[in-house]
Amino acid sequence: MNFIVLSSSRGTVFKAVLERIADRSLTAKCLGLISNREDHGCVTHAREAGLPIRIIPHTKGEDREAYDKKIHAAILDLMENKKPTTCVLACMGWMFLFSPWFVSIWKNQILNIHPSLLPKHPGAHAHALVLAAKETESGMTIHLIDEGLDTGTILVQKKCSVYPDDTVETLKARVQKLECEWYPKVLQIYPSACT
């Protein structure tokens, strides 16, 4: 299976995925990275791995569908004539909602990772929301993207404890450990993970 990474983050999970490819425990092939800024850590990881990179800047107030059409063109470029049905879009810290147009084109082919046990605490600042709610457990969710905000079909959820003295940083570290372990596993078995 082929996948393209969409990331606008430091790339912690992306780096873990690349390490699993390097040690051959993940046999899926990464065709490249799409990011919105050159200075993100994910771009550094892609560059070090020798992967093609496409930077698609996002301007404040830009129409979602117009931006998604640029993303779509970059995806097709990275696919180099491969059939769209042989490729998954793996969002790893992608901080933009997709338009209904984009979701309809890539239906059931867009994976996302979220740092909470959805449907609890969707959207940004999940760790802070978990702590504010005084939850005793948190975790991560890998799900398909649909038209909503973190509402798509859940593929995998893994839990971890939340301790009374946790901070956003300590909880984030614990959840990221789960994310780094499980995203490569889902990429290895997808699409059978949802059948």
Regions found by a protein language model. Give the residues of each.
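Membrane-interface segments of envelope glycosyltransferases acting on lipid-linked substrates or membrane lipids
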Residues: M1-I4, K15, L31, K69, ...
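N-terminal beta1-alpha1 ligand-phosphate binding loop
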Residues: M1-T44
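Donor/substrate-binding cores of folate-linked one-carbon enzymes
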Residues: R20, A49, T86, A90-T195
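Active-site catalytic pocket residues across diverse enzymes, especially alpha/beta-hydrolases
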Residues: I21-S25, M79, K134
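Short hydrophobic/aromatic-enriched beta-strand-loop microsegments
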Residues: K29-L31, P52-P57, Q109-H114
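Conserved nucleotide-sugar phosphate-binding/catalytic loop shared by glycosyltransferases and other
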Residues: H40-G61
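Short phosphate-binding loop-to-helix
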Residues: T59-K82, V88-F96
